[in-house]
Amino acid sequence: MKSASIPIYLQQAIMNTLRQKLQQANLYLNRDFPEPTINYRQRGTTAGSAYIKNWEIRLNPVLLIENQQAFIDEVVPHELAHLLVYRYFGKVPPHGKQWRWMMEEVLNVPANRTHKFKIDSVRSQTFTYYCNCQQHELTLRRHNKILRGESHYICQKCGEKLIAKSIDSLNPNLYPMDFKMHRGGKGVNPREHR
């Protein structure tokens, strides 16, 4: 990840939104939730994360600088809602009805589960794998786990194990790599199985 220095005006805007939304929630819910810590150490393509045990919100500095207003308006309330939901309802699904209610009714922000930011600047090297129905791009970390025989991944759509294949027509001696690992698991995206 590229390192990014967050300008003071942007840090202040983040804190202003955080404090305003927290005050809004405290008034609506008749509570006195403490102010979470904000740090700028989120990595990869994730815009932000809420750490419940630390009462902390981590923001991706590169994506923040590239998408300033969207972070202020959407990402900060999104992550704050996760913290508030946990304190108010206990352990519930991360983007379930309680989270949607907190976003829309309490914080007055659309309950979008994912961001739509361009991620070219934070995208890491990927490796192409295939199943019976589509192509998948796996991260270097997942690719290396497969090579070491520690994991394999299953397509959630067709249920088949992902296999690295060479589509290099210049080298007909390259065959699909198939690792001798058992099949298993289900999910929506390619998932790790041990």
From Swiss-Prot:
<dbReference type="InterPro" id="IPR035240">
    <property type="entry name" value="SprT_Zn_ribbon"/>
</dbReference>
<feature type="domain" description="SprT-like">
    <location>
        <begin position="20"/>
        <end position="163"/>
    </location>
</feature>
<dbReference type="Pfam" id="PF10263">
    <property type="entry name" value="SprT-like"/>
</dbReference>
<feature type="binding site">
    <location>
        <position position="82"/>
    </location>
    <ligand>
        <name>Zn(2+)</name>
    </ligand>
</feature>
<feature type="binding site">
    <location>
        <position position="78"/>
    </location>
    <ligand>
        <name>Zn(2+)</name>
    </ligand>
</feature>
<dbReference type="GO" id="GO:0006950">
    <property type="term" value="P:response to stress"/>
</dbReference>
<keyword id="KW-0963">Cytoplasm</keyword>
<dbReference type="InterPro" id="IPR006640">
    <property type="entry name" value="SprT-like_domain"/>
</dbReference>
<dbReference type="GO" id="GO:0005737">
    <property type="term" value="C:cytoplasm"/>
</dbReference>
<keyword id="KW-0862">Zinc</keyword>
<keyword id="KW-0479">Metal-binding</keyword>
<dbReference type="InterPro" id="IPR023483">
    <property type="entry name" value="Uncharacterised_SprT"/>
</dbReference>
<dbReference type="GO" id="GO:0008270">
    <property type="term" value="F:zinc ion binding"/>
</dbReference>
<dbReference type="Pfam" id="PF17283">
    <property type="entry name" value="Zn_ribbon_SprT"/>
</dbReference>
<protein>
    <recommendedName>
        <fullName>Protein SprT</fullName>
    </recommendedName>
</protein>
<feature type="active site">
    <location>
        <position position="79"/>
    </location>
</feature>
<comment type="similarity">
    <text>Belongs to the SprT family.</text>
</comment>
